[in-house]
UniProtKB/Swiss-Prot annotation:
Gene3D superfamilies: 3.30.70.100, Rhodanese-like domain. PANTHER family: RHODANESE-LIKE DOMAIN-CONTAINING PROTEIN 7-RELATED, THIOSULFATE SULFURTRANSFERASE/RHODANESE-LIKE DOMAIN-CONTAINING PROTEIN 2. One of its GO terms (biological process) is tRNA modification. It comes from the Bacteria. The keyword Oxidoreductase applies. Residues 130-224 form the Rhodanese domain. Catalyzes oxygen-dependent 5-hydroxyuridine (ho5U) modification at position 34 in tRNAs. Keywords: Oxidoreductase, tRNA processing. The gene is trhO. This is tRNA uridine(34) hydroxylase. The active site is at C184. The keyword Oxidoreductase applies. It catalyses: uridine(34) in tRNA + AH2 + O2 = 5-hydroxyuridine(34) in tRNA + A + H2O. Belongs to the TrhO family. It comes from Rhizobium johnstonii (strain DSM 114642 / LMG 32736 / 3841).
Amino acid sequence: MTDSLTHTSPFLVAALYHFVSVPRFADLQAPLQTLCEENGVKGTLLLAHEGINGTIAGPDAGIHAVLAFLRAQPEFSGLEHKESRASKMPFLRMKVKLKKEIVTMGVEDIDPNKVVGTYVAAKDWNTLISDPDTIVIDTRNDYETAIGTFRGALDPKTKSFREFPEWVRQNPGLHNKPKVAMYCTGGIRCEKATAFMKAEGFDEVYHLKGGILKYLEEVPQEESLWDGACFVFDERVSVEHGLKEGEHRLCHACRNPITAEETTSPLYEEGVSCSHCYHTRTEEDRLRYRQRQHQIALAKKRGQRHIGS
């Protein structure tokens, strides 16, 4: 992360997850919510029996206070996180949610606390994925892979992570090479994806430690095998090498990332439609979206943020 980015971007963004058994996870919800609100921290944290997952943003001191609280809990003493910066607050509110799982794949008895793939550091990733004996798999969804991916990676074109297991089972050719290298945004989906692959009989299964975000942070652009931008689940929409904020916008009708060029399409209307969703929405849908967009515009005039923006 460059000093200039730090100086011009006042909000610290922390992406984190940790798989660990947390029997009394519900007891953390209220104090964590209060601590975040008191420190000006916003975002989403998911708590479950299997651990914690989420992304939060706020002033540096606020983020550090939340991380210190979490690491003071015995279960989360080994919690790791990834940092980036944002020029404006990328979240509207703070939500601490209780869940059955911290990432949902829909397959029973997959436990990353018991079996998981081999972690590969960002500095060693290029060597692994350049090996002709390695199949590289992007475990993210189609709207994420559309704006960036590693060269030569297989794209399952899934709409949700729940579709990933079926894609694997329908592609026996994945067994044709001895090594499988997998990656996702921050690493959490690969925890379950690699555990699933091991359960399906794949022996040499690897995943990028810290995900794409860690790779973009640590690997110089001139050495990078990453093409494009990385979709992130906040109002920045995408980040690039050095974790610099990307130039993508979000279509608030379909939640797909779009480029500045795509906003010149006759099918684009802010908050209403884009070339990705125009033909999949009805005129009634677009009328509803226009009404919402009108409310957003009114809220901005009043100096407020509409909750649906």
